[in-house]
Amino acid sequence: MRYFILMFTFVCSFVAAQPTIVPQLQQQVTDLTSSLNSQEKKELTHKLESIFNNTQVQIAVLIVPTTKDETIEQYATRVFDNWRLGDAKRNDGILIVVAWSDRTVRIQVGYGLEEKVTDALAGDIIRSNMIPAFKQQKLAKGLELAINALNNQLTSQHQYPTNPSESESASSSDHYYFAIFWVFAVMFFPFWFFHQGSNFCRACKSGVCISAIYLLDLFLFSDKIFSIAVFSFFFTFTIFMVFTCLCVLQKRASGRSYHSDNSGSAGGSDSGGFSGGGGSSGGGGASGRW
């Protein structure tokens, strides 16, 4: 009998020491307490899907009875790390965890949203929207108010691009095409259009035309107008390059050998695209108790 009691005590203590499980992420709202009815889950899910479609921010809700020996912060971090909410590059996931029997709640925010959904804002949402409703045993109402508050914050001040590198790619493409045009223009303008005059005059004429085309493109198609200083530098540099090319070609054509041990070569390096973590959280957010 004594051994049976010892074994029973050991088993009970072992079971009690097991941490709360992290369920598999299969839907936006996971309720392990069965506190929400099907209609409430459907409405909350619809709101979360709408937020994702409008902002690309992934928000998930998890309701558990208790976090046992873990704090709500520890458990929420473990769930976030397991679920990896948010885009891998933007790290813009949000997790709402409610431990209903413990009467604790946590809003865990991904790295990429910590400046948008600050700790202070998350705490205010919990205190002003969730806890008053939870005290009245209105779980669905508190979650709805919190989701609405998060949605207002996300949509009023920030809009996520579907492809974060889209604008960078377009800008890089524009620079690439103009670089090709500039190289060909510097090489062929003096021979196609300006045959007469000294090398300096031909360089000036070519520089004026090339710079004028570039300036016209800025005024017609660009959202930004470069300053006069930038344009002047481009104009001067173009004239210098054309003049140098003409002098080199003239010396070669006249039979004099021209060798340059330190000939310049223009090169560019494409910087690698920025890559984020992978839907992770650094512990940003806030917790509350009622």
UniProtKB/Swiss-Prot annotation:
Keyword terms: Cell membrane, Membrane, Signal, Transmembrane, Transmembrane helix
Pfam families: TPM_phosphatase
Localization in the cell: Cell membrane
Transmembrane segments: 175-195, 206-226, 228-248
Topology in the lipid bilayer: Multi-pass membrane protein
Gly residues bias locations: 265-290
Repeat found in the keyword field: no
Protein name in the entry: UPF0603 protein YgcG
Species of the source: Escherichia coli (strain K12)
